[in-house]
């Protein structure tokens, strides 16, 4: 038998999705044009846009917490504060990127092109100047330039949300950014318990109890040992394998706790 708490969380989840949608439209209609009007320089405009989205997402996270949809913990949150970092994270849930942007002040990320046309997201995407996932070489160069300019770049190296119980495979794009840019990697281990908002879940498929979302920001992984490889492809493949093994071990440790 489903409890009053379950139906409250279902209502609260619907309300949070409603707020997110309305907020996205308001950003597109009011905030994004205002930022463009006030800040004529593109770089300044995108910095202000990123900060605005950061604060909006932080308030949205608190709305979900206060309404009883979820609780959260962050281990090593102080590591989010330093600018110009490359963050790699696993991707179990739809709200992973919302959490990361909410707690990293000046965040950049690679987004699907369709988000720049979606009425609920295009305002935020354009205001912040997020990187469109288009031609691979252009994405690589823009990603490197973004980190060098002081943004912190988020990459989910799986390329999509993790399928529960499925294979854990990384694409090489994140390794190419790290190696070409000479950036150490800050790994973030994300856990959702119970699982929710996976690729196969609808928004109303809420878990039987309140979701607890956790992020553990780990110590940097140096890429120096891979920079001397004669072949860039071999270096990227080797680093990707190391990262896969690292994340698999960390996630398995979560399952044991």
Can you say where each PLM-predicted feature lies in the sequence?
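A transmembrane-helix-recognition feature enriched in membrane-embedded lipid enzymes
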Residues: 2-73, 123
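Catalytic core of membrane glycerolipid acyltransferases/transacylases, capturing the structured
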Residues: 33-55, 67, 81-135
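Short gly/ser/thr-rich secondary-structure transition/capping motifs
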Residues: 66-74, 133-137, 197-200
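A generic structural signal for alpha->beta connector loops
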Residues: 69-71, 106, 127, 150, ...
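Hydrophobic beta-strand scaffold residues
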Residues: 71-72, 132, 153, 185
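Glycine-rich helix-loop-beta junction characteristic of Rossmann-like nucleotide cofactor-binding loops
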Residues: 76-80
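Non-catalytic C-terminal accessory region of glycerolipid acyltransferases
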Residues: 140-257
């Amino acid at each position: 038998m489903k409890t009053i708490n379950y139906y409250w969380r279902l209502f609260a989840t619907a309300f949070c999705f409603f707020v997110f949608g309305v907020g996205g439209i308001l950003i597109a209609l009011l905030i994004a044009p205002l930022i463009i009007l006030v800040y004529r320089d593109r770089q300044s405009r995108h910095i202000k846009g990123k900060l605005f989205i950061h604060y909006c997402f932080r308030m949205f996270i608190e709305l979900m917490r206060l309404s009883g949809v979820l609780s959260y913990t962050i281990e090593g949150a102080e590591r989010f504060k330093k600018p110009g970092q490359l963050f790699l994270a696993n991707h179990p849930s739809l709200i992973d990127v919302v959490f990361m942007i909410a707690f990293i002040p000046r965040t950049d990320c690679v987004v699907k092109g369709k988000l720049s046309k979606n009425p609920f997201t295009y305002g935020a995407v354009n205001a912040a100047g997020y990187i469109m996932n288009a031609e691979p070489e252009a994405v690589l160069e823009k990603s490197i330039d973004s980190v060098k300019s002081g943004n912190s770049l988020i990459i989910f190296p799986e390329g999509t949300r993790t399928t529960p119980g499925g294979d854990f495979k990384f694409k090489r794009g994140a390794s190419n950014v790290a190696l070409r840019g000479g950036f150490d990697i800050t790994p973030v281990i994300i856990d959702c318990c119970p699982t929710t908002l996976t690729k196969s879940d609808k928004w109303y498929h809420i878990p039987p109890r309140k979701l607890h979302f956790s992020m553990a920001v780990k110590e940097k992984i140096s890429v120096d040992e891979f920079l001397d490889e004669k072949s860039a492809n071999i270096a990227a493949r080797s680093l990707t394998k190391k990262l896969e093994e690292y994340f698999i071990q960390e996630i398995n440790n979560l399952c044991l706790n």
